[in-house]
């Protein structure tokens, strides 16, 4: 499938060279070439100024120089593509100096990667090479949380002594001389530099997230939701309110689905095997459980008993009574917890043969 918009996502500090180095690696050095339609840059206030002056100004203007030197097509990258991370008060961050600054960076990066990955026409390439180490980590983790099959993660490798050199931005087509750093500077020809892309495999967790975290949620809350599948399942059923607490998430069920869940949870708690609910004995056992939790004056028991009684003569029809309730419970668990986390309950508590 061909995606209509290729977006390169980078994070930078005071060394914006990562942008031109990565574009060079993707669009010039790698075969087949991957040329972005757009660049999105996450950075601090100081980092944004450094990127603007070094990459986007008329001189030195390293971004356009790279594009013109190698005949690359137009790539959208201007001041509007540079996103400055803000603190909890909405003030631009000059640097990431403390825990709250890093939390703000994590939430900004997670929110933006989630938004860009929500468009099926976008193909994302995320570089973790620039910025603070925590920024690279957050970028990689955000892509793991929300990345799709078409998205990629990489690091760019630059040969010494060009690596981290403030005057090196990409290998030039022709001779361009810079000086080594230190007390005894030596000439270096940028034409001889080697820039390579190291693609990084990553685990895609998107489909395992609860539905609400696919459109919102802080970084820490989303990570917590993704990690639920590793925890021991814990379920609490409040009979009076027909309320279910799974992990730390609440679910409210109707009378009959709640009774079905309570029945199966009790069986699991007692270590009983899966029940064949196409057999009349299953209907009798469920009815006895429902009678314990439903108001006898409400008429609910009579309706359930009537619905089960005429189905007992046909095993398929009896199973069809339970199936919609089972499907409803499963769906709510998956919506609330995500598929992997919900499977801990579905496999243990709702293990029923049909």
Where are the regions that the model predicts?
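Long, low-complexity, Lys/Arg-enriched
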Residues: 1-124, 137-354
